[in-house]
Amino acid sequence: MTHINSALEDADPNIASLIQEESKRQENHLELIASENFTSKAVMEAQGSVLTNKYAEGLPNKRYYGGCEHIDKIEGLAIERAKQLFKAEWANVQPHSGAQANFSVFLSLLEPGEKIMGMDLSHGGHLTHGSPVNVSGKWFKAIHYGVDKETQRLEMENVREIALKNRPKLIICGYSAYPRNIDFLAFRSIADEVGAYLLADMAHIAGLVATGIHPSPIPHCDVVTTTTHKTLRGPRGGLILCRNAEFGKRFDKAVFPGSQGGPLEHVIAAKAVAFGEALKPGFSSYCEQLVKNSKALAKRMQDRGIAVVSNGTDNHIVLLDLRSIDMTGKEADSLVSAINVTTNKNTVPFDPKSPFVTSGLRLGTAALTTRGFDEPAFLEVADLIADRLLNPTDLILKNKCQQRVLDLCNRFPLYD
């Protein structure tokens, strides 16, 4: 029994040491991966609590296990806060991830072999929106739409034509590398015209939707899924929302027992904490600054001669088109990684390179904005990235860029 009272550094010094090393990496690197953010200590405290010990299959007050009286209250708070935050009538907070949330929707609304329609992965879509390597592309007949070749933005008339030609059962809007606002009302009109369900996957923009900076999909879509991290700043997890409570109930059974067993109640508690944080006024200020930072970053990259997909951004994503400097995403990712800037290579629309090489580099402002970075700081970030990419063989400049990164990290510390 004594093992349960041992501190991690005593029970498993190897893991404790690696966690400490990762903590140092996060503190001393510039985190620009668009799907990552930093949670509060309160969120981490909830997730690392005794709630991890409890099994709670079912829904609040409808459990298959006893001893859930406190769990029910915690999950109930998470549900009510999610509904309040997004102005939804129904919510399920149990999905372990955004992918699980999407799969639960498919399980509820579709039969194998039916048609789904989502954005092409290389244009900014997501694996779970019909990619052939994902179950969504294996079980369903996937049709894809993309952006205009010139503007690199969605042209809704083109989306409409593809929908009319293919008559999908489900249309998906919401993306992983699309830096512009989404016209949910236009998607609703198209879905109605072809008799399709409409799913919005707002995983990347949930924080912006919650604060009204991005238009909400809730009034226009049959169902909405999201992750709870990214711009929402919560723990890694998923969430399903509906404007209609009766319609939403069908997804409860799709989550459990349809696609999951016991919910992760320690993560659900952390979600509740994050939703509570997002309901406070300071979160709106954070999201407003996040977008300002993105626009500043995009403009400075363009000023330095590096093209930006769609010629700018409306959200936290800045997607660089490195064909403008004759460089691949793989090369660029390696170059900035060497100065402790964390990004990811990414395809750009109509990319001639493979997904393992790519012509793009995806940047995101969510994590550094959490650290307190403002527009002047992001101009510094843009300049050191541009300096590195435009002078890849200059080792003296590389060392200077490394020091500039460390100076920025010291000016904007992560955790006390």
Swiss-Prot record:
The modification N6-(pyridoxal phosphate)lysine is found at K230. Pathway: One-carbon metabolism; tetrahydrofolate interconversion; Amino-acid biosynthesis; glycine biosynthesis; glycine from L-serine: step 1/1. One of its GO terms (biological process) is tetrahydrofolate interconversion. It is an enzyme of class 2 (transferase). Pfam families: SHMT. Its cofactor is pyridoxal 5'-phosphate. Its main location: cytoplasm. It catalyses: (6R)-5,10-methylene-5,6,7,8-tetrahydrofolate + glycine + H2O = (6S)-5,6,7,8-tetrahydrofolate + L-serine. (6S)-5,6,7,8-tetrahydrofolate binds at L121, G125, H126, L127, S354, P355, F356. It comes from the Bacteria. GO terms for cellular component: cytosol. GO terms for molecular function: glycine hydroxymethyltransferase activity; pyridoxal phosphate binding. Its EC number is 2.1.2.1. The record marks H229 as: Plays an important role in substrate specificity. It is found in: Cytoplasm. Keywords: Amino-acid biosynthesis, Cytoplasm, One-carbon metabolism, Pyridoxal phosphate, Transferase. Belongs to the SHMT family. Catalyzes the reversible interconversion of serine and glycine with tetrahydrofolate (THF) serving as the one-carbon carrier. This reaction serves as the major source of one-carbon groups required for the biosynthesis of purines, thymidylate, methionine, and other important biomolecules. Also exhibits THF-independent aldolase activity toward beta-hydroxyamino acids, producing glycine and aldehydes, via a retro-aldol mechanism. Homodimer. This is Serine hydroxymethyltransferase. It comes from Prochlorococcus marinus (strain MIT 9211). The gene is glyA.
